[in-house]
């Protein structure tokens, strides 16, 4: 299952690899585009992340996937980790590729003079911002310009997963991001990934994380069981 799938491009990519995929997003307009893009190859469900276990009928999956720019819209990372656990079969895997919380803490309005402006750690109150354009190539204006977002520190994310009964199997920080996040300070490689032109080792801009659901909330180890649906 692909959480916060938006218009479903990553969801469709998983389907093309042979997976039976369910995409979940709370935006009906996004899912309209996703269904037009994927046709019958993917099942799309309209719901917010925290409602996913109930909306999906307590169905369990082999894999939960979350992509870049998703976790920042969630106010409670510990609650999210529990949702992910509830969606997985014992032995099921979580895979995340996300923007690094260091990147989200930067003020990106002037890439020539970067400064830490926003919280690195999760806060009770959201960061409220106003956006004039979307990352989608379009000449249409944004109708709902006010956004509410929350950052989550890397340690907070890992600890939330461990406390929910996951075993962390891989965590990598990366120097590249799939868009020009820092204006004139980044250059694209042959894959279309952007890194700092000078000394890219200075700044992590994305990370990937893999974890396996192995432990129940009480601390006992669960035996692997069959999946009711795979993705």
Question: Where does each model-flagged region fall?
Answer:
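Short alpha-helix
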Residues: 147-171
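Core SAM-dependent methyltransferase catalytic element
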Residues: 164-166, 188-190, 194, 198-225
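Acceptor-substrate binding/catalytic loop of class I
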Residues: 98-112, 140-156
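A short SAM/SAH-binding and catalytic strip from SAM-dependent methyltransferases
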Residues: 62-78
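A short glycine-rich, Lys/Arg-flanked "PGG" loop and its adjoining helix->strand segment in the class I
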Residues: 78-93
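A short acidic, Gly/Pro-enriched loop at the edge of an enzyme's catalytic core
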Residues: 54-64
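Conserved class I S-adenosyl-L-methionine
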Residues: 93-135
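Class I SAM-dependent methyltransferase SAM/SAH-binding core
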Residues: 1-53
């Amino acid at each position: 299952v692909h959480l916060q799938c938006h218009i479903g491009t990553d969801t469709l990519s998983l389907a093309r690899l042979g997976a039976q995929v369910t995409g979940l997003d709370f935006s009906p307009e996004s899912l309209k585009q996703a269904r037009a893009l994927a046709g019958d190859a993917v099942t799309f469900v309209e719901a917010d992340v925290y409602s996913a276990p109930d909306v999906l009928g307590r169905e369990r999956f082999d894999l939960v996937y979350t992509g870049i720019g998703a976790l920042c819209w969630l106010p409670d990372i510990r609650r999210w980790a529990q949702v992910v656990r509830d969606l997985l079969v014992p032995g099921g895997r979580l895979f995340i590729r996300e923007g690094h919380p260091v990147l989200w803490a930067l003020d990106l309005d002037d890439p020539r003079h970067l400064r830490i402006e926003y919280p690195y750690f999760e806060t009770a109150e959201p960061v409220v911002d106003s956006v004039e354009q979307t990352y989608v190539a379009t000449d249409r204006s944004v109708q709902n310009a006010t956004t509410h977002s929350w950052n989550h520190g890397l340690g907070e994310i890992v600890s939330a997963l461990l406390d929910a009964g996951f075993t962390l199997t891989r965590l990598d920080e990366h120097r590249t991001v799939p868009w020009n996040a820092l204006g004139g300070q980044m250059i694209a490689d042959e894959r279309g990934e952007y890194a700092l032109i000078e000394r890219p080792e200075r700044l992590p801009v994305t990370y990937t994380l893999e974890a396996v659901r192995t432990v129940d909330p009480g601390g006992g180890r669960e035996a692997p069981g069959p999946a009711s649906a795979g993705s």
